[in-house]
Amino acid sequence: ARDGYISQPENCVYHCFPGSSGCDTLCKEKGGTGGHCGYKEGRGLACWCLELPDNVGIIVDGIKCHT
């Protein structure tokens, strides 16, 4: 397990609003212990998760979001 900005399949962040419970819910649904809305340089507001399982993608630096 590891902490990180949870990633959608195309290496895109899950955008969020500071103070909302959306990230905590998303992270727990994906098997993490929780999360919050953080700021990822170059990506903007993004969900940060704690203790995500290794099979859940996190943002890889240097690879652009490609939808």
Swiss-Prot record:
Alpha toxins bind voltage-independently at site-3 of sodium channels (Nav) and inhibit the inactivation of the activated channels, thereby blocking neuronal transmission. Is highly toxic to insects (tested on the crickets A.domesticus). This peptide may also be toxic to mammals, since it is similar to alpha-like toxins that are active on both insect and mammalian sodium channels. Disulfide bonds join C12-C65, C16-C37, C23-C47, C27-C49. One of its GO terms (cellular component) is extracellular region. It holds the Pfam family Toxin_3. This is Toxin Bl-1. It comes from the Eukaryota. GO terms for biological process: defense response. SMART domains: Knot1 (SM00505). Expressed by the venom gland. Has the structural arrangement of an alpha-helix connected to antiparallel beta-sheets by disulfide bonds (CS-alpha/beta). Transmembrane segments: none annotated. The modification Threonine amide is found at T67. Gene3D superfamilies: Knottin, scorpion toxin-like. Residues 2-66 form the LCN-type CS-alpha/beta domain. Keywords: Amidation, Disulfide bond, Ion channel impairing toxin, Neurotoxin, Secreted, Toxin, Voltage-gated sodium channel impairing toxin.
